[in-house]
Amino acid sequence: MKTILASETMEIPEGVTVQVAAKVVTVEGPRGKLTRNFKHLNLDFQLLEGGRKLQVDAWFGTRRTMAAIRTAISHVQNLITGVTKGYRYKMRFVYAHFPINASITNSNTAIEIRNFLGEKKVRKVDMLEGVTILRSEKVKDELVLDGNDIELVSRSAALINQKCHVKNKDIRKFLDGIYVSDKGTITEDA
């Protein structure tokens, strides 16, 4: 069965401007500017009330198109959170015997991992565009990844995690690696 028209609206907070041009949504806020392309979705985007509300419509949509409405709104909310608060992922080093040695290079945009499982090989991971990496000052063996785009921050964390993958061993026993321990925003809610 097809629904004739399904729509959902979302509020746009103060201090954030949203522009829509041919299914490309641009969100600008105090932390910067993010753009997302929704051309692959069969949806209509329009701004209401002088740019204070965003409405997403689906005409004659199937179940999959109806689900895409909420997905698109969630993506735009992630963009708004990114340009207002920013995203922060924390990663911890886990090792049983050989301490993992990590050094941050390229002005906080790359990390070199040494002594993983006692190996001599140096593993280098470049962060994706707009993501910075720091060693935590308060907690030992912790990395902090900061950025505005949640997808780039989480993918950078995944790249670090995958570089420290234990091969040819039982991963239930060899738990060494760098794992995500906390996900949140840079500016905490008061």
Curated annotation (Swiss-Prot):
* GO biological process per UniProt: cytoplasmic translation
Q: Which GO terms describe its cellular component?
A: cytosolic large ribosomal subunit
Q: Which Pfam families match?
A: Ribosomal_L6 (PF00347)
According to UniProt, the name of this protein is: Large ribosomal subunit protein uL6
Q: Which domain of life is it from?
A: Eukaryota
List UniProt keywords, sorted A-Z: Ribonucleoprotein, Ribosomal protein
Keyword hit for Hydrolase: no
One GO MF term on file is: structural constituent of ribosome
